[in-house]
Regions:
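Active-site-proximal alpha-helical segments within enzyme catalytic domains
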Residues: 1, 121-151
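Short secondary-structure transition/capping segments
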Residues: 52, 56, 130, 157-158
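Conserved SxxK-family serine transpeptidase/carboxypeptidase catalytic domain
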Residues: 144-172
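Active-site-adjacent helix/loop patches that line small-molecule binding or acyl-intermediate pockets
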Residues: 4-120, 125, 136
Length: 172
């Protein structure tokens, strides 16, 4: 569903970012302004601030604003309900489970489903399961847009002084 997006937009769609103006601009580019109010991200401040300090929390500063925007865009394109996209009963979540099962096996089920700090359902995983998912992404990097988006734009994935960005830049 993201075929016609730029690499920057794809990178912010999988990011857990610092909330800088660069991150906010990329996340906002995913949605028409009329859909901005549908975002269910928590209110937040930029993680790292230089110069003039931001004191008013906004949804776009949330480290998951790009994920939320991309999911809303995908829901629109698929004709899914956009009002409840963060619920574990939403078609998006079932699609997410299928992607995880691609790496962990079709019969895999999480022991627990909870809500994370970004408002999304999150799954319980063992360290071995997480490693299998990351290994699967690396193994399929030539067939998967996620790897290319992250390596093309590591600063959008995390940002200044973030371990994920540093690792991507070092290994790329």
């Amino acid at each position: 569903e993201l075929d016609n997006l730029s690499w920057e937009q794809k990178a912010i769609a999988v990011a857990s970012h610092n909330g800088t103006s660069e991150h906010v601009k990329a996340a906002q580019s995913l949605l028409p302004q009329s859909d901005w109010g549908l975002m269910q991200t928590p209110l937040d401040l930029p993680l790292v601030q230089f110069g003039r300090q931001v004191r008013r929390a906004r949804r776009w500063y949330s480290n998951s604003s790009g994920q939320h925007a991309a999911i809303l865009l995908g829901c629109r394109r698929k004709g899914w309900n956009i009002a409840c996209y963060t619920l574990p009963s939403h078609p998006f979540f079932f699609g997410f489970l299928e992607e995880i099962r691609h790496f962990l096996g079709k019969d895999w089920n999480p022991q627990r489903i909870a809500r994370d700090g970004d408002g999304f359902p999150t799954l319980s995983n063992t360290v071995n399961e997480l490693a299998a998912c990351y290994a699967g992404l690396a193994k399929e990097k030539d067939d998967n847009w996620i790897w290319e988006a992250m390596t093309r734009h590591p600063d959008l994935v995390g940002g200044f002084n973030r371990l994920d960005t540093t690792i991507i830049k070092t290994c790329n």
